[in-house]
C-alpha cells in the first residue's frame, strides 16, 4: 500500500490515492488541481523521508469548498458585568487525492 504524509494548512495528513481529505481553504477553484508537499512516502517496505521525499509530488483535485461548524468564543470578567461573545467559522476545502508520484 502506497501512502504519503503531506503538509496542508499547517497540519500533516496521511493520504493515499482516492482519499477524500478536508483541509483549510485551498486557493483553487472547484474542479481545479493542487499540489501538496510530501514529507514522507511509504511504498511497501521502502520509506522516503526528508530530502529523499523532496521530489515526491502529491496531486489532488478540489471537490468542494465549505465552512466548518461555528465555534463560539466567550470572554467573561467576574464582578464587572463584562462579557463578550464572538463566533468564528473556518473556511474549508474537500480534496480528492489523484496521484502520488
From Swiss-Prot:
Keywords associated with the record: Ribonucleoprotein, Ribosomal protein, RNA-binding, rRNA-binding
Molecular-function GO terms, alphabetical: rRNA binding; structural constituent of ribosome
Signal peptide: none
InterPro entries: bL21-like, bL21-like_sf, Ribosomal_bL21
Gene Ontology BP terms: translation
GO CC, one annotated term: ribosome
Pfam families: Ribosomal_L21p
Domain of life: Bacteria
Record text on subunit structure and interactions: Part of the 50S ribosomal subunit. Contacts protein L20.
Family of the protein in this entry: Belongs to the bacterial ribosomal protein bL21 family.
The protein's role, per its UniProt record: This protein binds to 23S rRNA in the presence of protein L20.
Cross-referenced PANTHER family: 50S RIBOSOMAL PROTEIN L21 (PTHR21349), LARGE RIBOSOMAL SUBUNIT PROTEIN BL21M (PTHR21349:SF0)
HAMAP family, per database record: Ribosomal_bL21
Name under which the protein is recorded: Large ribosomal subunit protein bL21
Gene it is expressed from: rplU
Amino acid at each position: 500500500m502506497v501512502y504519503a504524509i503531506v503538509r496542508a494548512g499547517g497540519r500533516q495528513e496521511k493520504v493515499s490515492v482516492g482519499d477524500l481529505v478536508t483541509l483549510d481553504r485551498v486557493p483553487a477553484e472547484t474542479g481545479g488541481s493542487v499540489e501538496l508537499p510530501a514529507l514522507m512516502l511509504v511504498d511497501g517496505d521502502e520509506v522516503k523521508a526528508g530530502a529523499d521525499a523532496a521530489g515526491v509530488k502529491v496531486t489532488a483535485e478540489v471537490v468542494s469548498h465549505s465552512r466548518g461548524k461555528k465555534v463560539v468564543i466567550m470572554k467573561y470578567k467576574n464582578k464587572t458585568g463584562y462579557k463578550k461573545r464572538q463566533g468564528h467559522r473556518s473556511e474549508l476545502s474537500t480534496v480528492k487525492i489523484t496521484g502520488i508520484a
